[in-house]
C-alpha cells in the first residue's frame, strides 16, 4: 500500500539499524514523546533492535495519561447529573478518577455517549435542546483545533445547552520540565509529528538552544522512528544540537496557520496540572472569557480538589523517562487494562498499555 508499505520496509529498516550501530560509540538515552510512537516501538521491537546502542524511554505524549485525576473527577460529577448528556471519546471512559470512572457512571444510568468528533457533540446538543450536553475536550495541540471549531460553531449557532470541559496541554513546556529536572537522563528527543503538523516545528528551536539538546521531529512508522534515532545518534556523536525534521512529508516549519489562528481565538495559554507530574507553567489551554458561556467548569461551578495518585502507581515516573512499565511491581498483576491503577495502562496510547499488549513478559509478544 503506497505511503504505508515503504515505511515498513524491512530492508530499509535493517539499513537504519546498521547505521545506528556504526554511528554509536556509547549508549545514548533518547525519548519519544508521542504515545503512538511508543506503540510502534513496542509492536515492532524497535527498542530491541537498537539495544546496547540506544536506550529508548517514553515521554508524556499521551493526552489521556496526563489528564489529572481532579479533571476526571469533575467529568464524573457532571456525567452523573440527570439533566446532562456527557459526551467523550471512548478512551476516556475507563480512565480512573479518585473513586470510579465514566464507564461505571454510565453503567449506573448516567447518559454518557461516545463520539468520534467534537462536531458530533454539537449535533447532539442541537438535537436535544432540553438537555445540557457537555463534551470532554482532552488532548494536545493535535486535537485542540477540532475542539475549538466545535466551540466556534456552538457560539455561531448560539447553542445555550452545549459546553466543553476542556483539558488541553502543550508539548514544549513538558519537554522543558524534563530537561530542567536534576534527575533527567534524556539526551535527545523524537518530537511528535502529529503535534508539529499543527504547530510546526519552529517552537522547538528554543529548547534546542536553551538546553543544547538535539530534537528530531519524527513520524510513526518503523522506518520513521529508526531514521529519527539515526539522526539523533549522529548529532550526539558529532556534538551537535540541532532541530531536524524527519517527518517532512507532513510537517513544515510554520505548521497549519489557520488551525493556530483558530486556537488563538478560542483558547489562551495557562498553567495546567499534569497527572502524576504536577503543575507545569504555561503548559495548557483554557477557554477565553468570550467563550465563558460554553465553559463547563464555570457553568457547573466545579471546585478544584487535590487528589493523590495510588501510591503503587509509577506512571508519573514512566512519563518522565525515569522508569519503564516493567519496573512497576503492580504491572500486569494488580494493574492491567481491565483494572488499571493509572491512566497509562488504560489509554490506547499509554506506555503501560503498550508494554502489556506487546511485551508484558519482558519479551516481544507475537502480533499478527
Residue ranges and their predicted role:
Residues 1-130, 144, 148, 154-157, ...:
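Metallocofactor- and cofactor-centric catalytic cores in central/energy metabolism, strongly enriched
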Residues 71-74, 126-133, 177-182, 204-206, ...:
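Short, surface-exposed amphipathic charged segments that create phosphate/polyanion-binding patches used
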Residues 97, 171-182, 225-228:
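Glycine-rich, charge-decorated loop segments at or immediately adjacent to ligand/cofactor-binding or catalytic sites
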Residues 226-317:
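Internal helical hairpin/lid segments
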Amino acid at each position: 500500500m503506497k505511503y504505508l508499505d515503504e515505511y515498513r520496509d524491512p530492508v530499509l529498516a535493517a539499513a537504519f539499524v546498521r547505521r545506528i550501530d556504526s554511528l554509536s560509540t556509547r549508549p545514548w538515552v533518547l525519548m519519544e514523546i508521542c504515545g503512538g510512537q511508543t506503540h510502534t516501538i513496542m509492536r515492532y521491537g524497535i527498542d530491541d533492535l537498537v539495544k546496547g546502542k540506544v536506550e529508548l524511554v517514553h515521554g508524556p505524549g499521551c493526552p489521556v495519561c496526563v489528564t489529572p485525576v481532579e479533571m476526571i473527577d469533575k467529568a464524573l460529577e457532571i456525567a452523573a447529573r440527570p439533566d446532562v448528556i456527557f459526551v467523550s471519546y471512548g478512551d476516556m471512559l475507563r480512565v480512573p478518577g479518585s473513586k470510579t470512572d465514566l464507564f461505571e457512571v454510565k453503567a449506573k444510568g448516567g447518559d454518557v455517549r461516545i463520539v468520534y468528533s467534537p462536531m458530533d457533540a454539537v449535533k447532539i446538543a442541537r438535537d436535544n435542546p432540553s438537555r445540557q450536553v457537555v463534551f470532554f475536550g482532552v488532548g494536545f495541540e493535535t486535537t485542540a483545533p477540532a475542539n475549538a471549531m466545535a466551540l466556534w460553531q456552538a457560539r455561531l449557532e448560539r447553542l445555550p445547552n452545549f459546553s466543553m470541559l476542556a483539558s488541553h496541554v502543550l508539548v514544549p513546556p513538558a519537554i522543558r520540565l524534563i530537561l530542567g529536572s536534576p534527575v533527567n537522563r534524556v539526551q535527545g528527543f523524537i518530537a511528535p509529528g502529529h503535534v508539529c503538523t499543527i504547530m510546526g516545528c519552529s517552537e522547538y528551536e528554543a529548547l534546542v538552544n536553551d538546553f543544547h539538546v538535539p530534537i528530531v521531529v519524527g513520524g510513526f512508522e518503523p522506518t520513521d522512528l529508526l531514521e529519527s534515532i539515526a539522526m539523533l545518534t549522529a548529532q550526539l556523536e558529532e556534538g551537535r544540537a540541532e532541530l531536524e525534521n524527519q517527518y517532512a512529508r507532513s510537517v513544515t516549519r510554520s505548521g497549519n496557520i489557520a488551525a493556530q489562528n483558530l486556537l488563538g481565538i478560542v483558547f489562551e495559554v495557562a498553567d495546567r496540572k499534569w497527572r502524576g507530574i504536577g503543575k507545569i507553567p504555561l503548559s495548557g489551554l483554557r477557554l477565553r472569557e468570550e467563550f465563558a458561556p460554553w465553559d463547563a467548569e464555570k457553568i457547573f461551578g466545579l471546585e478544584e480538589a487535590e487528589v493523590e495518585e495510588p501510591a503503587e502507581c509509577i506512571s508519573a515516573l514512566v512519563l518522565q523517562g525515569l522508569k519503564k512499565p516493567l519496573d512497576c511491581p503492580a504491572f500486569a498483576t494488580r494493574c492491567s487494562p481491565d483494572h488499571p491503577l493509572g491512566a497509562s495502562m488504560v489509554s490506547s496510547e499509554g506506555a503501560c498499555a503498550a508494554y502489556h499488549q506487546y511485551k508484558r513478559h519482558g519479551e516481544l509478544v507475537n502480533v499478527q
